[in-house]
Amino acid sequence: MEKKGSVLMLRYEVGKFLGQGTFAKVYHARHLKTGDSVAIKVIDKERILKVGMTEQIKREISAMRLLRHPNIVELHEVMATKSKIYFVMEHVKGGELFNKVSTGKLREDVARKYFQQLVRAVDFCHSRGVCHRDLKPENLLLDEHGNLKISDFGLSALSDSRRQDGLLHTTCGTPAYVAPEVISRNGYDGFKADVWSCGVILFVLLAGYLPFRDSNLMELYKKIGKAEVKFPNWLAPGAKRLLKRILDPNPNTRVSTEKIMKSSWFRKGLQEEVKESVEEETEVDAEAEGNASAEKEKKRCINLNAFEIISLSTGFDLSGLFEKGEEKEEMRFTSNREASEITEKLVEIGKDLKMKVRKKEHEWRVKMSAEATVVEAEVFEIAPSYHMVVLKKSGGDTAEYKRVMKESIRPALIDFVLAWH
């Protein structure tokens, strides 16, 4: 794989070495059929298994697969051999944003442009239940047109990564960019921690240096905990006001991405751009506003874990990366309907088919039994108002299961389905 000119999986010609991290090397490559330029991250499977990094890799795949946005590095496909995992990603040619600020501060209008793209992308991530947890200039790339691209979701957490208190409990991120509550180790909201990191990045772009600096790590943590910031005198009043709201040590009063995007400093010079990929993804939020039972439903509906989400996604069957499993007779679809609506519809379909229908109270499972086959359906939450529904044969004849699905159940669900997988 390290040799320039070698061919990977009969699909990609490997090019020059681009860089490496602790567990991965990145190469430029070219798709043999299309000629498209890509970046391939090569991960040593044995190394990550030895150090217990399996879940982190699964999270990165899940996060990147869920996110399709102009300002997020796109994951095209994942491949694997016995010893390696390959992430085939969009090749971002403009280098790191870090290189732009390594020589000093940026002009206010330039810094604002990058910050606008960053916050819009982070807000999009959060709407999909994903927090990045390691936002910093080194993880922000620039394309050939100077547009920002967020990369490196290795530390990302989906909403299912939380404990019962709804908080994350692992200290992630680079020290200078982490929020006070992350350092405290008492659990934190990853979405609010991302906002803090965005504030640190904005400060660096405008000032040319970090807001919290100390050679002693404990002293650095103290400064972060107290949000001790000295603003340079050249900072515009509007930028200073916004930074104070973002770099609030109290996560409960810290400004949200939504409010940041409404601030006058943020909106200055902002042009509303038509982004088809964003609009397409945003459809899943069309019915995000629920009734009074929505909060209860959110608690009861089972969240897919990160690996399950990606494994269920079209074109990304990763079951063989780390474990082997038996093939199951099942079909899946995504929906933007509430879990209660989906289960009610499934009950209705079962009754129309004269099947024996059983639904447990407070659970989003429906069992439809006929003489020849048994179909079980379960609803999983991927993000708020975005669900994955799994319909599987739990008994009876496989041919009859497929017939019932094709002729009756699938057509009856047409208004509930975003996509079959």
From Swiss-Prot:
Cofactor: Mn(2+)
Annotated binding of ATP, by residue: L18, G19, Q20, G21, T22, F23, A24, K25, V26, K41
Enzyme class (EC, first level): transferase
PROSITE patterns (alphabetical): NAF (PS50816), PROTEIN_KINASE_ATP (PS00107), PROTEIN_KINASE_DOM (PS50011), PROTEIN_KINASE_ST (PS00108)
Active site: D134 (proton acceptor)
Record GO biological process: abscisic acid-activated signaling pathway; negative regulation of abscisic acid-activated signaling pathway
Enzyme Commission designation: 2.7.11.1
Ranges where the NAF domain occurs: 299-323
Modified residues (Phosphothreonine): T170
InterPro entries in alphabetical order: Kinase-like_dom_sf, NAF/FISL_domain, NAF_dom, Prot_kinase_dom, Protein_kinase_ATP_BS, Ser/Thr_kinase_AS
Signal recorded as keyword: no
Molecular functions (GO terms): ATP binding; protein kinase activity; protein serine kinase activity; protein serine/threonine kinase activity
Sequence positions bearing Phosphoserine: S156
Family: Belongs to the protein kinase superfamily. CAMK Ser/Thr protein kinase family. SNF1 subfamily.
Domain comment (free text): The activation loop within the kinase domain is the target of phosphorylation/activation by upstream protein kinases. The PPI motif mediates the interaction with the ABI (abscisic acid-insensitive) phosphatases.
Protein name as catalogued: CBL-interacting serine/threonine-protein kinase 15
Organism: Arabidopsis thaliana
Lineage: Eukaryota, Viridiplantae, Streptophyta, Embryophyta, Tracheophyta
